[in-house]
């Protein structure tokens, strides 16, 4: 009887994009990879009592993924990214062990993993360890928001700018005057500029404002009325689509 000394095969890590939060918006391929996985790692936030909360884990449970294979890992949420990078490094060390033992591992991202997602750090750290990855696309939040209200983002040759920062109301108005439609991500960072533009923009400019769309039905909010938008606080999970109509 011979004994094989061949190494344990190492499967590529699946980076699975979950979409904006509605479990039904995950792709069929993404769901298949989750069901094939032996371990699923998902980012989580540490609470004051030491527990971890994870929107990604909530989505996985809604998809009937076995809780026993879900592995939340804490990610520090601060402007100083050093602590978060340390958290990603710790998660990758755990993932590398799982891979070396022959397990199929998936890592999840809300929205799309290649669109303003911190999972780029995970992919880079895995590459440094020569661990292959497979990226599976997801529905970005702004696409889900537009679909939820039948909003057109762009047509024909219209240019679209996706912004996460804005220097002033004038910058927003200048982009509109150049014939561009705008997707304003993370508007809490520049709320004053947006609200100033609300008061100055021509009447044919539509401001579509969304909160928690596709993620939390109890908190989801939409309006295209400028006076209502001006009163909102622009929470973290908010965005606007702005264009001439």
Where is each model-derived feature located?
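General beta-strand structural signal in soluble alpha/beta enzymes
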Residues: 42, 71-72, 107-109, 135-138, ...
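Class I S-adenosyl-L-methionine
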Residues: 2-24, 28-132, 220, 235-239, ...
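A polyampholytic, Gly/Pro-enriched intrinsically disordered region
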Residues: 90-97, 152-164, 226-238
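Class I SAM-dependent methyltransferase SAM-binding "motif I" and its flanking Rossmann-like core
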Residues: 111-178, 231, 245
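A short acidic, often aromatic-flanked loop/helix-cap motif at beta-alpha or helix-coil junctions
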Residues: 76-81, 141-142, 168-170, 215-217
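Short gly/pro/ser/thr-enriched loop/turn and capping motifs at secondary-structure boundaries
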Residues: 47-50, 140-143, 191-192, 215-217
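A contiguous loop/helix-start segment that scaffolds small-molecule binding in enzyme catalytic cores
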Residues: 13, 176-245
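Short, surface-exposed amphipathic charged segments that create phosphate/polyanion-binding patches used
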Residues: 84-91, 148-151, 175-179, 220-227
């Amino acid at each position: 009887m011979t004994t094989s000394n061949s190494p344990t095969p190492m499967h590529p890590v699946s980076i699975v994009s979950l979409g904006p939060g509605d479990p039904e918006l995950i792709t069929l391929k993404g769901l298949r990879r989750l069901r094939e996985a032996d371990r699923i790692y998902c980012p989580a936030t540490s609470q004051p009592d030491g527990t971890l909360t994870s929107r990604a884990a909530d989505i996985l449970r809604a998809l009937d993924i076995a809780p026993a294979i879900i592995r939340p890992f804490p990610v520090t949420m601060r402007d100083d990214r050093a602590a978060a990078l340390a958290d990603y490094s710790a998660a990758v060390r755990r993932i590398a062990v799982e891979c070396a033992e022959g397990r199929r591992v998936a890592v999840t991202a809300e929205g799309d993993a290649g669109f303003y997602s911190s999972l780029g750090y995970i992919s880079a750290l895995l590459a440094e360890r020569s661990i292959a990855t497979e990226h599976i696309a997801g529905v970005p939040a702004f696409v889900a928001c537009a679909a939820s209200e039948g909003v057109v983002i762009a047509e024909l040759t219209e240019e679209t700018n996706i912004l996460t920062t804005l220097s002033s109301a004038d910058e927003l108005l200048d982009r509109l005057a150049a014939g561009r439609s705008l997707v304003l991500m993370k508007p809490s960072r520049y709320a004053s500029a947006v609200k100033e533009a609300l008061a100055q923009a021509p009447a044919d400019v539509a401001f579509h404002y969304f909160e928690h769309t596709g993620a939390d039905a109890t908190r989801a909010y939409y309006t295209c009325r400028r006076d209502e938008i001006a009163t909102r606080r622009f929470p973290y999970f908010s965005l606007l689509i702005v264009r001439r109509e």
